Structures are given as structure tokens and as C-alpha cells.
A protein has these predicted regions:
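Mixed-charge (Asp/Glu-Lys/Arg
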Residues: 1-107, 112-199
Length: 199
């Protein structure tokens, strides 16, 4: 009995078109899978880089001359690093934090924190001037939609319209608190007074 040698892969693919299509689909599927894994890894790397930068900033802020210089420095920070900085500072105070899956496309929600068992949404904004009252109004609507309170944390000035909008929300069951200036610095310094001033 004579044993024939197996056909080469090329000859097999030429003879059997179904097998050829199967190999092509397998190859395309592998490329898509590698692309998705690379993209996921890039987002994980980016998140890790923002977190490391935020950790460095938390160490650097106390070395700056005063609160005005600290706020000025924060205004120049990458917006995603600023978000991570706030969440990291809250975690270091023992608060449970929920991060978004991604930094952009968050519909105005930059994270969540649980304070004394109550869920609060976080909106982080780096402003060099007065905050836009429309941003405060949009965030207030988001609080109603999510049925919880919110912390609008920013580096700018809080104008009269924004203050009024936040004050009027306190009569709602979903209050909105604006954290900036001294309270922002207290939060980043690990001083729990920033929370008590909300209550």
C-alpha cells in the first residue's frame, strides 16, 4: 500500500473554495480581534498615564506657594488629568468612586462618588474665567435624570447666575453643589471640610 503525501496547503485551498473562504474569514477575524485588543490596550494605557500624572500633581500641589498659584496651575492641567485628580483625591479620603469607562462622550458626567452612602455625580470643568451658567443648568438636568445630587467642581469663578441655579437646586431632592476655590484646594489637600460645607 502506497501512502500518498498530503497535498500542500496552497493546492488544498485551490481545490476547495469553501476552505479558502473559511481561511480568509479566519484571517479577517484575527485582524479585527487584534485591532480591538490594541485599541483596548491603548485606552488602558492612556487611563494609567492620566492616573500617574494625577498622582504626581497631588504631590506637587502642596509645594506651590499659595492657593491662587495652585488654582492657576490646575487651570493648565489636561482636562482628563483634572478629572482623574479629583477622583483620586476623593479615593484617598476613603470615598467610593466610580470612574467612567472612557473620558470623552460622557454626556457631562465625569465620575461618581458615594458620600455617607449617598450617590453624587461629578462634573469637572477647567475654567480660566467665570463658569458658563448653561453648563450648570445642563448638569442640574442630568441630576434629575439620574435621581441623585451632584458636585460641579471647577477652577474658574462662579458667577451670580450659576450660584443662583445651584442655590435653587438645593430645594430639590437632587441638590447641586459648586466646589471651587478654597473648597477645591481643601478637596485636593485631603481636608474633609470640603464635604461638610455641602451639608
Amino acid at each position: 500500500m502506497v501512502h500518498s503525501l498530503p497535498m500542500s496547503l496552497t493546492a488544498l485551498l485551490l481545490v476547495n473554495p469553501v476552505l479558502t473562504i473559511g481561511f480568509i474569514l479566519l484571517f479577517i477575524g484575527s485582524l479585527i480581534s487584534m485591532s480591538l485588543n490594541w485599541r483596548e490596550k491603548a485606552s488602558v494605557r492612556r487611563h494609567r498615564r492620566y492616573r500617574h500624572t494625577a498622582e504626581r500633581l497631588l504631590r506637587k500641589l502642596p509645594t506651590l506657594a499659595g492657593d491662587a498659584q495652585r488654582v492657576s496651575y490646575l487651570r493648565r492641567v489636561n482636562p482628563y488629568v483634572f478629572e482623574e485628580l479629583l477622583l483620586l483625591a476623593m479615593e484617598r479620603q476613603g470615598l467610593q468612586v466610580i470612574r467612567n469607562a472612557s473620558y470623552s462622550g460622557d454626556s457631562g458626567l465625569d465620575g461618581q462618588v458615594f458620600i455617607e452612602g449617598q450617590r453624587w455625580l461629578i462634573q469637572a470643568k477647567r475654567y480660566s474665567r467665570a463658569i458658563d451658567p448653561a453648563h450648570v443648568a445642563e448638569f442640574s438636568a442630568l441630576l434629575i435624570q439620574h435621581r441623585c445630587g451632584g458636585l460641579f467642581i471647577h477652577t474658574g469663578r462662579t458667577g451670580a447666575k450659576s450660584k443662583q441655579h445651584a442655590i435653587s437646586s438645593h430645594s430639590n431632592i437632587f441638590p447641586l453643589y459648586i466646589i471651587s476655590g478654597q473648597r477645591l484646594i481643601a478637596l485636593l489637600a485631603g481636608n474633609p471640610d470640603w464635604i461638610r460645607k455641602n451639608q
